[in-house]
């Protein structure tokens, strides 16, 4: 426990909080031709490569992901959730933050049901997360 005179000489240092989705925390201003810091909940981008990746040790699968060039110029890896997708190169997608625990380097999710990422068909539960419409029965 420091004394008051010690705190006057050297104040307490705040902890530096590192962002978990850094590509969403800035954008590129084309008018001023420079990067500006502001936080966004989502960003749009264009798929450069759509491929699969194997997860870390105890799990085994082929997880689908896309390399996306965002509107601020950065390239990120984004996970494609749900069963089946129609994404290919040059597809325009919207991404959100949120990592995939067993895929190293994947810190973002593609939002299904918006732009070129179609919703999951025949999905009954958690439809809003996968952009699926309600079945007409």
From Swiss-Prot:
GO terms for molecular function: rRNA binding; structural constituent of ribosome; tRNA binding. GO terms for biological process: translation. One of its GO terms (cellular component) is small ribosomal subunit. InterPro entries: NA-bd_OB-fold (IPR012340), Ribosomal_uS12 (IPR006032), Ribosomal_uS12_bac (IPR005679). Keywords: Methylation, Ribonucleoprotein, Ribosomal protein, RNA-binding, rRNA-binding, tRNA-binding. PROSITE patterns: RIBOSOMAL_S12. Belongs to the universal ribosomal protein uS12 family. Part of the 30S ribosomal subunit. Contacts proteins S8 and S17. May interact with IF1 in the 30S initiation complex. With S4 and S5 plays an important role in translational accuracy. NCBIfam families: rpsL_bact (TIGR00981). This is Small ribosomal subunit protein uS12. It comes from Phytoplasma mali (strain AT). The gene is rpsL.
């Amino acid at each position: 426990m420091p004394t008051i005179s010690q705190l006057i000489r050297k104040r307490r240092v705040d902890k530096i909080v590192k962002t978990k989705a850094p590509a969403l925390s800035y954008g590129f201003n084309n008018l001023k031709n420079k990067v500006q810091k502001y936080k966004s909940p989502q960003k749009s981008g264009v798929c450069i490569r759509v491929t699969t990746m194997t997860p870390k040790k105890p799990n085994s699968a082929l997880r689908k992901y896309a390399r996306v060039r965002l509107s601020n110029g950065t390239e990120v890896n984004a996970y494609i959730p749900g069963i089946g997708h129609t994404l290919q190169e040059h597809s325009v997608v919207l991404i959100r933050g949120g990592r995939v625990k067993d895929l190293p380097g994947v810190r973002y999710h593609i939002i299904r049901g918006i732009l070129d990422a179609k919703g999951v068909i025949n999905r009954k539960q958690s439809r809003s997360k996968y952009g699926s419409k309600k079945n007409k029965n």
